Amino acid sequence: MAYTFCPKCGSRLESRAIDGRERPACPRCDFVDYENVKPCVGVLVVDEGKVLLVERGIEPFKGYWDIPGGFLESDEHPADAAKREMLEETGLLVEPVEVLDFWVDAYGDEEFMALNICYVARVVGGEAKAGSDAIRIEWFPLDALPQDIAFNWERPALEKLRDRLRD
């Protein structure tokens, strides 16, 4: 979300060329809105060739299938966020094994971009059940994924996971 007014002094921001890009900047003080990405995690768990997805219960993309995950808290390590989000959304305790990759993608129709850190994790406990902002959870074969995947970054992540497991 871009600022209209300076959060330091209240002046209206103006567009200014800074570091080779047009950025909202304050004409009275040193504030520049760099419009940084928001960090998120996604967690892929595979069991017997099937990956766990959640059906979103909130916007954006309510009713679409989603990789379990969410935004990091300001003081949270991404691996800890992965564990927390999996427990909240699926009831499962997981241990992140590796980072599959990173993707930058728009967060629905919002005016910000998200940096999605996608983990592969293994289940270490809990009971699989939909929680917090999930309507339901389901295990899908990696070769028969649903068409209605929520975010643009998720299909390449699922394809990368599928290709890695084939090798």
For the regions a language model picked out, list residue spans one by one.
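Active-site-adjacent beta-strand/loop module that shapes the phosphate/pyrophosphate-binding cleft
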Residues: 103-127
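Short functional micro-motifs and their immediate structural scaffolds
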Residues: 14-15, 34
